[in-house]
Design a protein with these regions (language model features):
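Secondary-structure boundary/capping residues
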Residues: 31, 57-61, 123
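Short gly/ser-rich anion-binding loops that grip negatively charged ligand groups
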Residues: 38, 42, 61, 68
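Conserved GNAT-fold acetyl-CoA-binding loop/helix
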Residues: 30-54
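Acyl-donor (CoA/ACP) binding surface of acyl/acetyltransferases
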Residues: 1-30, 66-178
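A short helix-loop-beta-strand connector motif used in the catalytic cores of GNAT acetyltransferases and
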Residues: 53-66, 75
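Polar/charged alpha-helical tracts
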Residues: 20, 46-54, 58, 176
Length: 178
């Protein structure tokens, strides 16, 4: 998959040869980035290669899409199969690229492609206080579905039983909106 998002941005499938892009993109992050089922990065070469291998949709992994400006990875989108006919969409954008429409373009384009290729229900989990993500969801055609108490993990530690959890708002993509 390779889509032109305009403004010198492309959304394309991440491939095994993209390990160096993942390393460079997440190297300045102070905390792991969450565009998949588990926090990702900052990466070593081995960790980036392992992540790309694990994200193989043919093996049941997520569809990982890079948001590139030229040859620089500025963000990513993960389409994670949840149940048959259901896909969670998660996204991450470099801090210096936030607020520039990068996420809006990718989060609007990815479900349109996914609805054509993988007819599914596509949804976002958003922390209730995350105002930028709530505005983005509304702007690009998602509708609020429900609030789930203590559903989303904070990923402060590896052990789920010791980690803290918070409420999540579920927003579902409406292909007829936006």
């Amino acid at each position: 998959m390779d889509l032109d998002l305009g403004d010198d941005l492309r959304l394309r499938s991440l491939a095994p040869g993209d390990a160096a892009l993942l390393i460079e993109a997440t190297s300045a992050e102070e905390a792991p980035s969450l565009w998949g089922a588990h926090p990702a990065g900052p990466y070593s070469l081995a960790a980036a290669q392992a992540a790309l291998a694990a994200w193989d949709p043919a093996a049941g992994g997520q569809f990982s899409l890079g948001i590139l400006r030229g040859q620089r990875l500025v963000g990513a989108v993960g389409l994670m199969p949840d149940n048959p006919g259901s896909i969670e969409l998660a996204y991450w954008v470099r801090p210096e690229e936030r607020g520039k429409g990068v996420a809006s373009r990718a989060v609007a384009a990815a479900p349109l492609w996914a609805h054509r290729e993988l007819p599914s229900r596509i949804w976002l989990e958003i922390e209730p206080g995350n105002e930028p993500s709530l505005r983005l969801a509304q702007r690009v055609g998602y509708r609020f579905e429900r609030r789930i108490s203590q559903h989303c993990r904070d990923w402060a530690c590896e052990d789920a039983a010791r980690d803290s959890w918070h409420d999540c708002l579920i927003w579902v993509h409406d292909p007829g909106a936006a």
